[in-house]
Amino acid sequence: MRIALATCLDMPRPDADLPILVEAFAARGARAEVVPWEDPRAEWGAFDAVLVRSTWNYVGRYRDFHAWIDRVAAATRLVNPRAALLWNLHKRYLAELAAAGIAVVPTGVVLHGTEPDWEALFARHGDLVVKPAVSAGSFATIRVRRGDVAAARAHREAHLERDLLVQPLLASVVSHGETNLVHFGGRFSHAVHKGARWDGDAEQSRGLVTPAADELALAQSVLAHVGSAGFGPLAYARVDMARGADGRPLLMELEIVEPSLFLDRAPGAADRLVEVVLGAV
């Protein structure tokens, strides 16, 4: 069996998950090959499945990446499924999850070419987090201190062609960081603690943690909604959360396109993912 691990040509940083996955697939008798998604020579239909991994440069080639998803899904099995990937590319999904009753960090979407009322946003939320609605990693994600309208407008101007997200900066993110819960086949695998990350920062995993019961419950409610929406079973998902002012966990992002899975931190995790992928092919 041949499995493609989709990555990208101009990697912003090494993907530590890739060699671990190649070895884990080999242990199950499958051949995993690392293939850049934008490689015009790639014959996707020759693979039994394409597992989306570190396609991190799609942010600057959104339409091309959308077309690639369509093309691969028509040629072979795409993991995660096409519908789930397309839904997750634009972070408007956070508003949908909030409307469904999921505890989500308050999120406003600023459509491309428009300017929000920054003064009102600062008055409502204090310090802000501003980032593109289509992004990977910490691309163009900044903290804007309360009242710094000039900085907010400058960032808006620099990314005028993009939809942006505006969220309050959670105090817990600054003081403690966030918790990322990794799931394979809808089941919890492992969790890591990460520090705050801004534009240009590297991933800052601080090691494995045991999530609290309310964090596990939030992650399950998020994944249950995705399942009920008909997006098909998810081979992998990373549910990122932090605690709000009242101490409750709040969803920050649901990563089902190209999340780092921190397989090097969790012995056996790669085997669990491989089992799910091979079981679906």
Language-model regions: role of each:
Residues 3-7, 69-75, 79-176, 210, ...:
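Active-site nucleotide/adenylate-binding loops and adjacent lid/helix of ATP-dependent enzymes
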Residues 2, 9-107, 111:
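Conserved N-proximal alpha/beta basic substrate-recognition cap immediately N-terminal to
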Residues 213-281:
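ATP-dependent carboxylate activation and anion-phosphoryl transfer catalytic cores
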Residues 142-229, 242, 250:
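Phosphate-binding site of ATP-dependent enzymes
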Residues 55, 133, 169-170, 182, ...:
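Anionic group-transfer/hydrolysis microenvironments
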Residues 56, 138, 197-198, 255-265:
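Glycine-rich phosphate/pyrophosphate-binding beta-alpha loops
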Residues 47-52, 180-183, 248-260:
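A short beta-strand motif that forms the metal-chelation/ATP-contact edge
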Residues 41-43, 135, 170-174, 242-245:
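A short beta-turn/loop motif at secondary-structure boundaries
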